[in-house]
Each structure stands twice: as C-alpha cells, then as structure tokens.
Amino acid sequence: MAIAVGSKLPAPPASLWENAPENSVTFPETGKIILLGVPGAFTPPCSSQIPEYIARYQEFADKGVAGIYVIAVNDIFCVKAWKEALAGGKDSQVHFCADSTGEYIKTLGLDFDASGLLGNHRSKRFAAVVENGEVKSLFVESEAPEITVTKAETVLGGL
C-alpha cells in the first residue's frame, strides 16, 4: 500500500545507505523534510532534476525544511559518485541515499517495473513533504521521465 497524505512515513531500513556501505540513513522525527524518489542515478532526467534542489537548498531551508533526501534504487557507490558529480565536488546539504534492493521504495509503495530499460524495479519519480513524521504533501509523476509536479519550483511553491 502506497503512502498517502496524512499517513505516517515508515522508518527507513538499515539497508538505506548514504555515502558508504553500512552508513544507515535515519530521518529526523521532528521538523520538515523532503523525500525525493528518482528512477536512477546518472539517468538524464534524474541528473537534470536534482541540481535545482541543490542550488535552491537555502530557499527550502528558509521555508523550514531541515533536510532533503534523494533516494535512488542503485548501489551506494553509484549514488555517491552521482552526488559528487552533481554537487561539483563540493559538499552538498542534500542527502543522496542508496536503496540498492528497492526495499524502502517498495515499503513506500512507490516502485515500478523498469526492467525493460533499467534492469529492475525502480522508484517512481516523487516528492514527499514530511512534517513530524507525517506525509503532508505527495507529488508523483505519471510517467518516469516527466519532471513537472516534482520540480523544485513546484515543491517550493507548495510549502
């Protein structure tokens, strides 16, 4: 069952990693965060979507966002390299998380079969605004390559 507005965000599994194997991700229990699901690191649409979130991070922070978490169904080494490529070698306040088996994305109910192009199940492209552990807004693209309702500008406008 997919998460929905008003539902509690499930805790991430220990296998959701950031920067290194075994470096498990936890989300703050209080405050406002944004989760971004993307089909794949280094894919052209995903690589064009995320830089806007990096560039506009301070605008999100000014609206009370304590963290932005990008989740891709890729291995940790791929996701870390993607972060470094998109952030231009600079430290980014946007978190890049690897859900290598897709376990968390499946728990959220936001996976789809991308085996024809990307080899396995992947994350739908989505943006979720979560406050104090509750989903306040959820934007899901109808087609994976589209970037309309999940654009940084659109999500900022809804905060």
Predicted regions, residues:
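Chalcogenol-based redox active-site neighborhoods
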Residues: 1-159
